[in-house]
């Protein structure tokens, strides 16, 4: 089982430690559904790729991401490469295990790419990674941070593993441990209920839930790979982006 959560954590830590506090990454602290990051129902979101990515990859990403549109009153439009006006701007020139996205309308407040997809077309996890990152682009947060998830994280084991992986790259042990502690707090532990609107029940089958290894938790707690949109994922989209005449549940 590929540990996507750990790979992304290592990537963020390297970005922070190498860039320094002034430029320590573009992702903001997020909630499962932060109202200020939602798009408008019925809006057309333009998708542009940076650089000169493979045409087959672009089509596959667009086709897979469009599965969300079956449950959300939104449209996607694939526009020319390197279009800075696009709401979703994707770079693919990253390491294969690097995949991330800004949350919803946060993409409007940064320059350059708002999403990175290092996954290759041949990767068996291609669909689930694309769906997961586009879930973020539509305003969804990681399900493992749901206020009611109650995941028994073994934070000591996680911290030790991350420190060992980065020990040769960071000369200041205390700075490294502080960065790891901050990352575990903001990216692993549950969010406050007040930060989550709308709050639906915790869903271990959500495409937004990373697989979790038993080695990173106490007891026998683990989660396998989720490969498709769950019923809650679909309902969440209908609440955020209701079609005309349908009832939604979102802050404005």
Which role fits each region the language model picked out?
Residues 1-252:
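Zinc-dependent metalloendopeptidases
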């Amino acid at each position: 089982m590929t540990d996507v959560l750990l790979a992304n954590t290592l990537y963020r830590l390297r970005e922070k430690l190498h860039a320094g506090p002034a430029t320590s990454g573009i992702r903001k602290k997020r909630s499962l559904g932060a109202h200020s990051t939602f798009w408008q129902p019925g809006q057309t979101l333009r998708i542009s790729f940076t650089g000169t990515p493979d045409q087959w990859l672009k089509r596959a990403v667009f086709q897979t991401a469009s599965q969300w549109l079956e449950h959300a009153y939104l449209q996607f439009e694939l526009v020319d490469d390197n279009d800075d006006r696009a709401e979703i701007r994707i770079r693919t020139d990253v390491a294969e295990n690097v995949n991330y996205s800004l949350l919803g309308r946060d993409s409007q407040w940064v320059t350059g790419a708002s999403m990175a997809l290092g996954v290759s077309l041949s990767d068996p996890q291609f669909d689930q990674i694309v769906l997961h990152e586009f879930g973020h682009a539509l305003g969804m947060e990681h399900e493992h941070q749901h206020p009611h998830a109650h995941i028994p994280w073994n934070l000591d084991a996680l911290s030790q593993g991350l420190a060992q992986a980065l020990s040769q790259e960071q000369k200041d042990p205390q700075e490294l441990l502080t960065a790891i502690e901050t990352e575990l707090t903001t990216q692993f532990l549950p969010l406050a209920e007040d930060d989550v609107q709308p709050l639906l029940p915790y869903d271990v089958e959500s495409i937004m839930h990373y697989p979790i290894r038993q080695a990173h938790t106490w007891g026998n707690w683990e989660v396998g790979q989720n490969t498709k949109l769950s019923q809650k994922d679909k309902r969440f989209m209908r609440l955020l982006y209701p079609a005309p005449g349908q009832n939604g549940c979102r802050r404005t």
